[in-house]
A protein has these predicted regions:
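N-terminal secretory signal peptides
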Residues: 1-10
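Short, acidic/polar
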Residues: 74-84, 150-159, 269-277, 333-335
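Conserved, mostly hydrophobic/aromatic
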Residues: 67, 84, 92, 124, ...
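N-terminal twin-arginine translocation
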Residues: 9-14, 25-51
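Glycine-rich, proline-tolerant flexible connector loops at the mouths of alpha/beta enzymes
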Residues: 95-119
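Active-site acidic/histidine proton-transfer and metal-coordination neighborhood
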Residues: 18-28, 51-57, 61, 79, ...
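Catalytic domains of carbohydrate-active enzymes, especially glycoside hydrolases
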Residues: 80-98
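Acidic/histidine-rich catalytic cores of soluble enzymes
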Residues: 62, 91-92, 134, 194-330, ...
Length: 383
């Protein structure tokens, strides 16, 4: 396995890819690496602990299942779409820049040339794949003006592309400013004491975060884009449901959630409660499908704020990302999908693969297998 170089900063996906071998070794005492990579069980248990084949009679919508395209960085657009169609997936979330990059979406070219945009869109249409969301995860409130300006422009261009495509959902991060006007790096503040931290947090929201997103939401609204779905992610000011709702209250109903439960599992959130709460408030705009496995021995020793920053640290980490079904079983995912149906979620389930053991195509296939089976169980139909 290639060791991560200290001379450069890898992307999260590069890091996770490089950690696969270490993770497999670290978990060998818990489960064999072969079992870690096999198809997860989709056996649904009743409360009595027996297999259930009963179907619900609720008039629930068949929520489409799709995938976020950074899972396939080495495939051309045509190759990726053929693979996605082969998995029987129905929708895609496409990265337009920022951290996800734009491997399959030459944003500026598509905006500049209507003919190119038409050809690009037809590739999806020909395979009956819906473009359900565009993603431009970045940090438009970064204290470095060049970074902030770049990411803000990517957001604006993504809005313009969404308008042309008729896409209503743009996925991203809230961003994180510095802690003062003179800071040069972001400062993620989660606790108000000692007092200077509380002052920094108040300054971030009042002077940077809320003003930027008010303007950004207005721009989106003017271009017929009404759903900005924020991933609740550590190192950004919106990192849990409470901070998401705080920004929504301050900015408006354009702000909603990209409910990526992989970041909420380790925070101790109940996924069904989160979905119900956000859904009842009309704030559920997108759903990343990604799992997290918790290493309880390390949680017991170190707590949950215990992440690996190098491959050498991974065996001591408290959690890491997995494909759907490899951190939590089919019963949990059935409850999650049921919750989305119960609140009338009108988006799609977007598989995001950041599993360090299962490469992109395999991780996506396994996640799709779980999600299609639990969806079929809930609807009383075949997967």
């Amino acid at each position: 396995m290639e060791k991560l170089s200290n001379s450069r900063t890898p992307s999260r996906r590069q890091f996770l890819s490089a950690t696969g071998g270490v993770l497999a070794a670290a978990t060998a005492s818990r489960i064999s690496s072969a079992k870690a990579a096999e198809f997860p069980s989709t056996s649904i248990q009743t409360n009595a602990g027996q297999n259930s084949s009963s179907s619900s009679t609720a008039p629930w919508r068949k929520i489409p299942i799709g995938v976020f395209d950074p899972a396939f960085p080495d495939l051309s657009l045509d190759q990726m779409l053929d693979k996605v169609a082969g998995y029987g997936l129905e929708a895609m979330e496409i990265g337009t820049g920022g951290y996800p990059d734009n491997h399959h979406c030459p944003l500026n070219d598509l905006l500049a040339d209507p003919a190119k945009l038409k050809v690009w869109k037809k590739k999806f249409d020909d395979r009956k794949i819906v473009i359900g969301a565009l993603s431009c995860h970045g940090n438009p409130v970064h204290p470095d003006a060049k970074i902030a300006g770049r990411d803000a422009q990517t957001f604006r261009n993504t809005v313009l592309l969404a308008e042309k495509l008729g896409v209503q959902v743009i996925v991203g991060f809230s961003g994180c400013p510095g802690g003062s006007p003179t800071d040069t790096t972001p400062n993620w503040v989660t606790y108000h004491w000692p007092p200077e931290y509380g002052q920094a947090l108040d300054w971030q929201w009042k002077e940077k975060v809320v003003p930027y997103w008010k303007d950004a939401a207005k721009f989106a609204r003017e271009h017929n884009v009404h759903k900005l779905a924020f991933e609740m992610h550590p190192n950004f000011v919106v990192y849990n449901p409470r901070t998401l709702l705080r920004l929504r209250e301050a900015v408006g109903e354009e702000i909603g959630a990209n409910c990526d439960l992989s970041h909420l599992f380790w925070q101790g959130c109940n996924p069904v409660e989160v979905i119900h709460m956000l859904g009842k408030q009309g704030a559920l705009y997108h759903a990343h499908m990604k799992d997290t496995v918790m290493f309880q021995n390390n949680v017991d020793r170190y707590g949950v704020l215990n992440f690996a920053s190098t491959t050498e640290e991974l065996p001591e980490a408290s959690e890491t990302f997995r494909a759907v079904g490899y951190g939590h079983g089919a019963n949990t995912w059935k409850d999650i999908v049921r919750a989305y149906m119960e609140v009338g979620y009108d988006g799609f389930l977007s598989i995001e693969n950041e599993d360090p053991i299962l490469p992109g195509d395999i991780g996506v296939e396994r996640a799709a297998y779980v999600l299609k089976n639990v969806r079929a169980e809930l609807l009383g139909s075949k997967a």
